[in-house]
Amino acid sequence: TARSRGLGDVYKRQPLMTKNDFKVIKNGNMDNSQTCLAIGPGTGLGFSVLRYVGNVPYVYPTELGNARSYNDHLSNLFEIDNCENFIVLEDYLSGTGIKKIYAEKSGQNLTTEEIVSGYLDDDLAKFILNNFVVALNNILQDLALTFNAKGGIFFAGSLMRTISEMNSINYIKEEFNKHSSKAHSNILKDISINLINKEHTPLYGNLNYSVIRRLHE
């Protein structure tokens, strides 16, 4: 998708970005020669896999947001009984998903911004956002192991920039490395998780996409 493509192309190798545009959430490796993942929960859920081959950037956009295998886990996590409006992953893990979950549980149609800004005072907002981070952590653990993402994981978008300032983000710092297998725990420990601070990330990504296309043609 264009959203996933934009996320992918904006990664660290993007010439319009500097080191100051990144914030480390969890320490680990950032090796350009290894597979990297970019994820951005916003209107939907963008997810791209990034890899350099022979000094040329390859971006693989995905349709992760339309996956369904996590539905049971997420409906239990968010305590949603009526799942009629929760069909795919991005119905839970996106800004739109946060709105839908809040409306389903309260009957109130607040904006994502209103829900996020109520984190400290609204118990339901806190419940949803805390579990949003739990769900994101669980899924990123699986994705990190699936793709062996030794180059790091990168969050993008205004929603993640805001959540990264909340106490809920500590769950990822404390839990991401945990696995029943010590060997796989060590793999997770070596994977860094980073936040892209730069605004309008998909715009920058799509601008760079045309450059990458020309390199391949």
At which residue positions do the language-model features occur?
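Short, well-ordered beta-to-alpha junction loops that form the rim of enzyme active sites
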Residues: 1, 41-43, 157-159
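Single conserved hydrophobic/aromatic residue that forms the stacking wall/gate
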Residues: 1-11
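Short, well-ordered, mixed-charge alpha-helical segments that flank or form enzyme active sites
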Residues: 9-12, 45-49, 56
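A gly/proline- and charged-residue-enriched helix-loop-helix capping module
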Residues: 12-34
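A short alpha->loop->secondary-structure connector
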Residues: 18-20, 54-64
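ATP-binding/phosphotransfer module of carbohydrate and carboxylate kinases, centering on a glycine-rich
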Residues: 26, 49, 75-217
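Short beta-strand scaffold segments in enzyme catalytic cores
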Residues: 36-40, 45-51
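A short, charged helix-loop
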Residues: 62-82
